[in-house]
């Protein structure tokens, strides 16, 4: 690896901070405030450069908006029959099919199909507070340090998981609350199978919980469905499919999920 890519090397070896996605989202949300402050306070050469950059951005945005509005121009979807009358030059293009409208409608149709494909049984779930999710662990000789946290919900850690050294482990995932398999129900076949979990795709509570593998109600998990014998249109065996957890694993002691088909 080149010497100047030490940041990428560190990310590959140690990963990112647990709250990286949250910090990134907040930084993007604050960007508008920073731009407004710079526009008011920058003086001299830096102010001129900033104004020039903002001007070019606004011009590009106006062009983009204008192009988007032109794509919505209504026109005849089918050309009229030729009745033998001559048309003036400025009316000749009105007989052509409006391709922009056709492209726009096809994009909307694809979006609707995609939304229908990835619709889930539980679109909304109740939020979980950090006080309920994490338990504070007191450490140190006199038990005065409180930088450690223990997850009180069920988690999935994977096969090759090894704990960090005790002195460096900030978040503890108890062995008794780790799950490896789930009771997955196929909605069309109406059967329930005990399938191994491959990974946690998305936890609706927070990206940090997704990275930690926390299993709560509404979480999307990937399960091994090779035992069901599902095949694709090309004849290949389906290995993993997504499922959504429909129960509270920490209350029931098991994971129940519905397969997303």
Swiss-Prot record:
Basic and acidic residues: compositionally biased ranges: 1-22
GO cellular component: nucleolus; preribosome, large subunit precursor
Highest taxon of source: Eukaryota
KW Cell inner membrane (keyword) present: no
InterPro entries, sorted: NSA2_fam, Ribosomal_Se8/biogenesis_NSA2
Cell location: Nucleus, Nucleolus
Residue span of region Disordered: 1-39, 61-85
Key words of the record: Nucleus, Ribonucleoprotein, Ribosome biogenesis, rRNA processing
UniProt motif (Nuclear localization signal) ranges: 15-22
GO annotation, biological process: maturation of 5.8S rRNA from tricistronic rRNA transcript (SSU-rRNA, 5.8S rRNA, LSU-rRNA); maturation of LSU-rRNA from tricistronic rRNA transcript (SSU-rRNA, 5.8S rRNA, LSU-rRNA)
Keyword Transferase recorded: no
Pfam families assigned to the protein according to its UniProt record, in alphabetical order: Ribosomal_S8e
Assigned protein family: Belongs to the eukaryotic ribosomal protein eS8 family. Ribosome biogenesis protein NSA2 subfamily.
Subunit structure of this chain's protein: Component of the pre-66S ribosomal particle. Interacts with NOP7 and RRP1. Interacts with RSA4 (via WD repeats).
Function: Involved in the biogenesis of the 60S ribosomal subunit. May play a part in the quality control of pre-60S particles.
Protein name from the UniProt record: Ribosome biogenesis protein NSA2
